[in-house]
Each structure stands twice: as structure tokens, then as C-alpha cells.
A protein has these predicted regions:
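Acidic low-complexity intrinsically disordered regions
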Residues: 1-46, 63, 71
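Beta-strand/loop nucleic-acid-binding surfaces
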Residues: 45-60
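Hydrophobic beta-strand signal
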Residues: 67-69, 142
Length: 390
């Protein structure tokens, strides 16, 4: 549909320039207009990205991050293409989309829909997460990771489990300031959309992509879709925002500006599930024990903001105990809303038993016992039978 004030381009010989199909994700400019960026091109800025006029954005109440499909017309005098008609916004007609509630108008509730990650007997990582740190739709999860504790492998295993068990979820991975070879590895192993601003990109790229990807996920959740976002890492994202805001005159310890973490914390806080339908699950990594006071302060600022925390341990990794999860420090808030009663009772008994051990011994025992069973269901049945005999 074309607003009446947007007349089509006319070629030099007076003939109208033909319309072509086009689509992309809307990135807004502070002056009110926008451009359609290509997800297949990592949302990079290209001269061929269609221009969306401000009056069209206002008319259809378009928000940053929406997927727009319509008709595009090539501009004259070396101008880029312009959107002339809008056919669909997030799979809806423009009129339907204009009536949808915004992200902040929807009602957030506690996660209640358990996302099972167990696939087969191996890997044990996802089976242990199901027992000790269960994830639900709308979870705000933080993976706390010292260097070389298996963070990358854990993220890959989680992404593969989500793709296998929950194909209805829209899986997105955001990589900020990561090594280029790791970006390539993730793109080859993750069966979802991988958006990356690698360490050879500038700070502005890190900040721009972080905000655009979150807005994209919010728009999908508004439209009733269930989105699963893996973010690696929230620490490097916060570092980028610290450089981006500059020096406002007030600096915390470690060289972090007082306002630098406002936006990253707001982005992480967008994870939620809506009563009306739709959800955004965020699993983000936080780096610790890097020798940087800034990283430690960033972790302390984010600690407690999630409703699930999984802590990786260097001592376990050094002994090659995988997954290197510190059981005593890891858990999910309100897990009783996710787990069925039998599983919850078994998990409580398991935690009581393991809590009396050193955390290294506890994980060694758990992995050894769990590997004997083909599924968590069999393992839980054994715990339940031993409880009945007692």
C-alpha cells in the first residue's frame, strides 16, 4: 500500500520506473526515516538498502526491527532504491500490524513452559541443565564463565538442543567482539540466524548490531513468536557501550562510566514471556577471572538480574570434568513452575546429596552416574524408587 504523497519515480524518457519486490529489517534513523537491512548480509549498511520515508513509517506505525515486505523502486540520479508500497509487516497486513500492542504494553509473567534440552544419552551438558538449571520460555539466563571452561561448546550444545527439540522457536545468536574464526565456527554449527560484530569491527558496529538484534527479537515476540537468543558475550557488549558513551565525568572502579551499563542492562532485561502469547528467551554469557577489573565490575552489575544462573568452574575444567558446572552456585528461580512434581522431588533429593560434597567431587559423581542411564527419565525413576524404599 502506497501513501498518497509518495509518487512513483519517472525515468528520463517519462516512463514510470517499474516496481520490484523487496524486503528487509527496518533500521530507524533519529530523523524519522529508515532503511531495510538484509539479515542474510549481517544487517550491514549497503548503498542498495531500500529507503523507507518517514511518512510511511508514521502512517503504518512501523517500529525498528520489523520485517517489511513490499515493492521497491530504483531511484534516479544515483539515488538508492525507495520503498513505494508495503505488503506485509511481520507476516501481517500493514493495517493489522498498526493495531498490534507494543512490547511494553504486553503483560510479562513468570516462565512456565519448560524448554527441555535433553536429546540423546550424550551430551551430558544439556541433560544436567534440564535437572539443575532448567530453562523456560522467557527465561533470562546468565552463564558465568572463566576463560577456557567450555563456554563455546556449551553454547553450541544448547543451540543444537533447541533446534532439535523446539523447531518452532526462532533461534538467534548474537556474537559481539568475538574472534573471526569463532564466528565462522558458530555459523557452521548453529542452525539459526548468527549475527556477528567480530573483534575487527569498530565500537559503533558492536553497539549498533546489539541494539538492532534486540529490537528484531522484540518485534518477533510482539507478533506472538517464541524467540531464543544466545548472546556471547554480555561482558564484551558492555565494554563496547563503555567506549561508546565516552567520558560523562563519573567513572566507577575499573574505568566503567556510570552510564555505560544502562543500555546493556536494559537489553538483557527484555527477556520475558507474555500472557498474550509470544516470548523472548535470552541466554547470555558473562566473563569472569580475566584479570580485568572492568570485567569483574560488569559481572557484579549483571549478577542477580537474571532468573537463571549457570556458573562454570576452572577447577573442574582443569581436571577435564565436563560440563564444568559448579552445582552449588547454579540454579533457576521458581523452578517449581517449570518442572513436573516427580522431577522436582528428584532434583531436590539430588541437590541434598551433592551439597554435602566438594563441588568438584559432586560434578564428577553426577556425570559418572548420569552416563549410566539412557535418559533423565530413567535416572529420575531410580531416585524416586530409592526414595520410596527409604
Amino acid at each position: 500500500m502506497r501513501p498518497p504523497d509518495l509518487e512513483p519515480e519517472v525515468s528520463e524518457n517519462g516512463e514510470p520506473v517499474p516496481l520490484e519486490p523487496g524486503e528487509g529489517v527496518l533500521e530507524m534513523h533519529p530523523n524519522g526515516y529508515g532503511f531495510l537491512r538484509s539479515p542474510a548480509n549481517n544487517y550491514s549498511r549497503e548503498r542498495t538498502d531500500p529507503f523507507v520515508p518517514a511518512q510511511m513509517i508514521d502512517r503504518f506505525r512501523l517500529r525498528e526491527g520489523v520485517l517489511v515486505k513490499g515493492k521497491v523502486q530504483q531511484g534516479r540520479r544515483q539515488q538508492g532504491p525507495r520503498v513505494r508500497e508495503i505488503d506485509e509487516v511481520e507476516g501481517m497486513s500493514p493495517e493489522q500490524y498498526a493495531e498490534t500492542k507494543t512490547f511494553d504494553q504486553l503483560t510479562p509473567i513468570n516462565p512456565e513452559d519448560w524448554l527441555r534440552l535433553e536429546t540423546e544419552q550424550q551430551p551430558l551438558t544439556t541433560r544436567i541443565m534440564d535437572l539443575l538449571t532448567p530453562l523456560g520460555k522467557g527465561q533470562r539466563a546468565l552463564i558465568v564463565a572463566p576463560p577456557r571452561t567450555g563456554k563455546t561448546v556449551l553454547l553450541q550444545q544448547v543451540s543444537q538442543a533447541v533446534s532439535t527439540n523446539h523447531p518452532e522457536l526462532s533461534l538467534v545468536m548474537l556474537l559481539v567482539d568475538e574472534r573471526p574464526e569463532e564466528v565462522t565456527d558458530m555459523r557452521r554449527s548453529v542452525q539459526g540466524e548468527v549475527v556477528a560484530s567480530s573483534l575487527d569491527c569498530d565500537v559503533e558496529s558492536h553497539v549498533r548490531l546489539s541494539q538492532l538484534v534486540i529490537e528484531r527479537c522484540k518485534r518477533m515476540a510482539e507478533a506472538g513468536k517464541d524467540v531464543f537468543l544466545l548472546m556471547d558475550s554480555i561482558t564484551r557488549m558492555a565494554r563496547a557501550f563503555n567506549k561508546w558513551v565516552g567520558n560523562t565525568g563519573r567513572t566507577m572502579s575499573g574505568g566503567v562510566d556510570i552510564k555505560a551499563l544502562d543500555i546493556p542492562k536494559k537489553l538483557f532485561a527484555t527477556a520475558r514471556v507474555f500472557e498474550e502469547g509470544g516470548s523472548l528467551t535470552i541466554v547470555a554469557t558473562a566473563l569472569i577471572d580475566t584479570g580485568s577489573r572492568m570485567d569483574e565490575l560488569i559481572f557484579q552489575e549483571f549478577k542477580g538480574t537474571g532468573n537463571m544462573e549457570l556458573v562454570l568452574d576452572r577447577k573442574l575444567a582443569d581436571r577435564r570434568v565436563w560440563p564444568a558446572i559448579d552445582i552449588s552456585q547454579s540454579g533457576t528461580r521458581r523452578e517449581e513452575k517449570l518442572l513436573d512434581p516427580d522431577t522436582l522431588h528428584a532434583v531436590n533429593m539430588l541437590r541434598r546429596t551433592l551439597s554435602s560434597m566438594h563441588h568438584v567431587d559432586a560434578m564428577e559423581q553426577l556425570t559418572k552416574q548420569l552416563a549410566k542411564f539412557k535418559s533423565n527419565r530413567e535416572f529420575i525413576a531410580l531416585i524416586a524408587s530409592s526414595r520410596a524404599n527409604d
